[in-house]
Amino acid sequence: MRAVVKSVYDRVFDAKEVKGMERILVINPGSTSTKLAVFDADKELFRLSIEHDQRETAKFLRAIDQLDFRKECVLNALKEHDIPLESLSCIVSRGGMLPPCQTGAYDVNADMLRFVNSDHLVKEHISNVGCAVAHAIAEPLNIPALIYDTVSVDELIPEARITGVPELPKESRGHALNTRAMARKCAEEMLHKDFDKCTFIVLHLGGGVSTWLFQNGRAIDMYSDDDSGFGPERCGRLQAAPLVALCYSGKYTEAQLAKLVRGNAGLKAHLGTSDVREVERMIAGGDEHARLIFSALGYSLAKGIGDLATVVSGKVDRIILTGGAAHSKALTGNIISHVEWIAPVEVMAGEYELEALASGALRVLRGEEKPHTFVWNG
């Protein structure tokens, strides 16, 4: 069950020569990979992505069942890169699909471990195993195990939760980790201001999309990829009546329809691909239908930014476009043309989840943030 290291970045310096009390192991489990990195304070020692054979992971029924498998992969990687376990000060992992949480750090405690091992999961997702792996490695070392800005961050103001159907209140789920990290980075490095005194709208552009409104450090409102603009493979906001009719048309099972709206929708449904680069090649080849759909993608996502700007009466310090698809100048240019009248726009392309996790853990180690306590009475 040995994992294959697909890519390893050069070390910043020799890890064995660095000592201190701020060495952080970062773990980010994905469906087909485990990404990890080791930082000494804010200096990255190394990072790698361990690719997993899907035939191996398919043997596990639930995400939490992969605990020993993922732990072994991480320990082997540390050994290969000459990182002694006793040199670690903290372990931080991407958080899973927990009940609604605040932004920031949470200690991995007994309640959290009971929850991810229970039948009460909000959603079965591989990120659910991350906290358990962090705890399993940290406990014998007597060091903190944390999660940070979990997928289930929910700090919505009361008005944002209310919909026209009381049984269907709005939920907050999306790319809280990357978007909040980019907002903090923009505040500190570009505006030279305290993140907790700024207002940002951040659009994450990946396979999934989500748009976040951060005011004074809190995520007070947001759009996920099922209630705003569509994405490369997500449906976005749909009219209710036709959707209800489609549900009862007999054309789809519940599972098929769920896959349609989250995985087979958006660019993929219209053009047969969710790869923005491929769509740009189609347009360059003269495909006018692709040009229209790609234009509509930016148009629909820009509307979500405009919606959130009204919540704060247009008083926005910066709009930020981030995520892998933000590398597309055509897409970001389209969005910017619609929203730059609201506030200046920063394109911060790519995903910085490992850095965001490490930075959050470092703030905890330095006493700049206090971790929350997860409580579950199930």
Pin down the residues of each PLM region.
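Short glycine-rich, Thr/Ser-proximal phosphate-binding strand/loop in the N-terminal lobe
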Residues: 24-65, 225, 229
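N-terminal phosphate-binding loop and adjacent alpha-helix
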Residues: 48-86, 112, 118-122
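Phosphate/pyrophosphate-binding loops at sites that engage ATP/ADP/AMP, CoA/4′-phosphopantetheine
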Residues: 76-89, 189-194, 304-317
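Adenine-nucleotide phosphate-binding core of ATP-dependent small-molecule kinases
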Residues: 259-314
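Glycine-rich phosphate-binding/hydrolytic loop that grips phosphoryl groups
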Residues: 326-327, 333, 346-378
